[in-house]
């Protein structure tokens, strides 16, 4: 009986530790701020591949967005 209670307590403790680690990991990810850089689009048209390749030349892009007229917005994490 005592062994079963100890095992149950250990399982519950492990569960809460893992839950806390997951929550703390999510909080740290949320704290990372996103920045964006606006760069001119060479062709003057919204071509997704052109924006994507222009944004990839910047530091660690997360996403790229083509905005009319003639601009690309590159999203990345602030350093």
From Swiss-Prot:
Keywords: Antimicrobial, Disulfide bond, Fungicide, Plant defense, Secreted, Signal. One of its GO terms (biological process) is defense response to fungus. GO terms for cellular component: extracellular region. It comes from the Eukaryota. Disulfide bonds join 35-78, 46-66, 51-72, 55-74. It is found in: Secreted. InterPro entries: DEFL. Its main location: secreted. Residues 1-25 form the signal peptide. It holds the Pfam family SLR1-BP. Belongs to the DEFL family. PANTHER family: DEFENSIN-LIKE PROTEIN 144-RELATED. This is Putative defensin-like protein 146.
């Amino acid at each position: 009986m005592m062994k079963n209670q100890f095992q149950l307590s250990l399982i519950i403790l492990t569960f809460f530790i893992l839950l806390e680690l997951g929550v703390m990991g999510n909080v740290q990810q949320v704290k990372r701020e996103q920045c964006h850089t606006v760069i001119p689009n060479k062709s003057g048209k919204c071509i997704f591949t052109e924006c994507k390749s222009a944004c990839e030349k910047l530091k660690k892009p997360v996403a790229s967005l083509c905005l009319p007229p003639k601009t690309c917005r590159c999203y990345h994490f602030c350093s």
